[in-house]
Amino acid sequence: STLIDARTQELVEARDEISSSIRYAAKLQKTLLPKSFPGDIDIEVEWRPRDLVGGDIYFIKDFPDKVYIAVVDCTGHGVPGAFLSIIARSHLDKAIRENENQTAGEYLSEVNELLRATLSRADQSNTNEEGFDGGVCIYRREARTLEFAGAKASLFNVDGEEATEVGGDRKSVGSSRIPEGFKYATHYIKRPSGAFV
């Protein structure tokens, strides 16, 4: 009985330590999410991860002439998805730093190449299908144009009572199944009234 009690106590302590680490990781992951949104654009976000940490993130980068917006659903749940979301977030930033003058499709294509390179270095056998599904938008303020590129994701533009779906490409970002050099399509929406991804 004392052996069983001791083993039970060890398991409880291990569980508590893991739970504490995951709660702290969730707090760290939240710091990657935008704290504020551009004042001239109505942006609403509902972020309710299934687990404390996971692979769902959103990203906003505001410039005087344009705004980059991304919604990302990384493969995997829990801790693996969270790690992948950190890598994806890093590449979303890097692709903008490398070229601020790109279309949404070029931007998503660059993120795809960066993620593929990172994942192929991590797993030489490349048997897993890590990556993400999601959409990126670039809103150009002066032209009042929204560009959209999607990876197994769609954008919906709601105008009054009519909703129009703009489908993305049927290829996940980072997937080893995508031909090298694949380019995501850019879709243009003039004066979007109620677009959401």
What are these regions (language model features)?
Residues 7-194:
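… and, occasionally, acidic/histidine-rich disordered N-termini of signaling adaptors
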